[in-house]
Amino acid sequence: FKFGIDLETYFHALMTRITGLTGFFSFFSTYRLIKFMKKFDPDVVHLHELHAYFVNYGTVIKYLKKNNIKTVWTFHCEFMYTGKCGHAYECDRWQTECNQCPQLRNYPKSLFFDFTKIMYLHKKRLFANFDNLIIVTPSKWLGLRVKKSFFKERCIEVINNGIDTENIFYPRDTTRLKEKLGINNEKVVLAVAP
């Protein structure tokens, strides 16, 4: 089920850049998602990222809280506990209260205004009394960061990303492949992916 509307996603991205507010738009897409949830009536909702210009996360959180729906939320970045940053890097303002953001021009980009304090406080209020929320992170590092945020009193679990070391990621004899590609054995081949 695709609830997002492409044109609205572009509008959301534009409005984020103009206003500096992230996650406050996509009204029609969000309405479609909530309409689907009402019809489906889930016992549990498992969320991942909600900040790519496709949903009004505040409306979704309010719906889940109001309807007392058990929610597991896997955080893959720091967006939900910072003013706006996907990754705060060395900035630690999110531990007390975001403002005067040093990453204003980074994703999600704001061209004019710094509303990171408003967005930080908005998120903090949204999550207050969300008793049916469990947060999952795919790494210890992110789990420790979440525990330093306003989520520190929440249930936070680390479930590491799984790696299949028997069928997919295992040492292989690469001699033939190197020969085929014209790479001599003196060179090391390193592949890195996000």
Per-region residue spans from a language model:
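Membrane-proximal helix-turn-helix segments that form the acceptor-binding/catalytic region
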Residues: 65-66, 70, 79, 94-135, ...
